[in-house]
Amino acid sequence: MLLVGTCNPSGEAATYNGLYYKQEELQELVRDGRLRGVPVKTEHTGLEIGRVVSSFLDSRGAQQCVMEVDESTVEGSIASGFVRDGIAADLSLGYSVDVQHSDDRLKAGEKRLLEILLVRRGAREGCHISAYQADGGGVVFKTPQDDAWSCFEMPQD
């Protein structure tokens, strides 16, 4: 199954010093092709179920990625079903940040991309799966109302 969605909203300003990606860092990720081949997992745990095949920035500057989920594995098949059913509706970008300590201040250094995650509800606003295509099928576009959990009153993570 192929998936496309927003894995990170538009980046922060160049003067930002924090844990989120700056816009220029997102541009570098795309330019250098660093998302290509990054593992796709579920809910910040578990086995790899696929890989990122492409990435781009949309007109708002948000990081988009195209992922291929391996449906020949049990885990990949289940995750694909969760996407089709709206149970896994969001994406999360997993990365580490090298935080430097000096003069009683913290400075965010290099960010290392680790994984893209299919999640029930992402931590960042607007990071949704927007479309998928099962093997041999047509493209299915998702809308925020497709969230299977929306009928339940769920606590915020």
Regions found by a protein language model. Give the residues of each.
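Polar/acidic, low-complexity leader/linker segments enriched in S/T/G and N/D
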Residues: 1-37, 138-155
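Residue microenvironments linked to proteolytic maturation
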Residues: 5, 12, 55-151
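Short low-complexity stretches enriched in small and charged residues
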Residues: 13-26, 45-51, 70-74
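Intrinsically disordered, low-complexity segments enriched in polar/charged residues with Gly/Pro
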Residues: 26-28, 40-43, 67-69, 103
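Short conserved beta-strand and strand-loop elements enriched in small hydrophobics
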Residues: 34-47, 91
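A glycine-rich, hydrophobic loop/mini-helix early in the fold
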Residues: 41-60
